[in-house]
Amino acid sequence: MRGLDQFLSTFTNRIDKKGRVSVPADWRAVLAARQSVGVLLFPAVYEPAIQGAGQDYLAELDRDIDALPRGSAERDDLIYTLKPSIRAFQWDSEGRLVLNDDLIAYAKLDEVATFVGLGQWFQIWRPEAWAVREAEAKQRVRAPRARPTT
């Protein structure tokens, strides 16, 4: 059934003083179905959030990089931006990840984190920042569009 293999929905969970936050159980099941031992986390390129994905993301990233001309600035920038910042994390027996200080600072997380499902990957946001980003996206989607005339 489609959907069970994707990161869907939105969850807000507390971050404890040790930087631990619970990964949504549905998402741990998605990662397990993908035979991902843990989760990859890195600073999102275009958003003030943490990007997350299963290990299968690396193959997708490599395909995207390989499609770019060798030696091109775009290819090099993509490699230099993403590859060094990707880290593998595993959750504990209670389904919690320990976020490192760099990721917490990048996303400006404090006591809570909002997990946002985006299909093949997810992001972890400061709740207030996500509310603004979500509202902007919904406003653009709902904006009247010019319809073709016949």
Protein language model features and the residues they cover:
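Flexible "stalk/tail and boundary" regions
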Residues: 1-12, 17-20, 27-94, 101-150
